[in-house]
């Protein structure tokens, strides 16, 4: 088996096995996440999308596939085509309006926010430059903080942290933000991927992190869309 085939197979494990393990954990802790879904996954794994819809989870735009990213080298025509196809497929498969956007691997061009606002997107979650939401100059589009510093791919796949250290990082970050939150509040988003944390040797560390975080009082666990709406109405 070549390296490319192996990489595809590892990620397919996330769709076949890891997703369902994480699904069970989120149900266990009554967590309703925002799920960024690319167009290719929505077409190839409709049952996964339906499971999210049935639970009332938010579906957000996430491009076409991991191999078709928006970058600074993308032309405006290419970028519009990616956004258009992504949103069309997700709206068709989910039966709901798509309000948010998570760029593939946090990627975008200098025009992405402007284009997203023109497509009716209300928030983007690609910038780790704050701990609270903030508005942009693009038709009121809101940026939801999304830290790469505790993203599972960034820490475990790229920086090679052990899963127990990832758990500790997440809990330490949550604890600090919780204590810093009063009175204005802070936001912590946690990006996870089924192909990575859904593995048998890692899933228990996600369980332990979620157990710890859901044990805190006065924490609002919500979707990115609800967070954006709340911020817009109260800023």
Predicted regions and their residues:
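Positively charged, amphipathic and often flexible ligand-engagement surfaces
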Residues: 144-165
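Catalytic alpha-helical scaffold of carbohydrate-active enzymes acting on polysaccharides/glycoconjugates
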Residues: 4-143, 167-190, 196-235
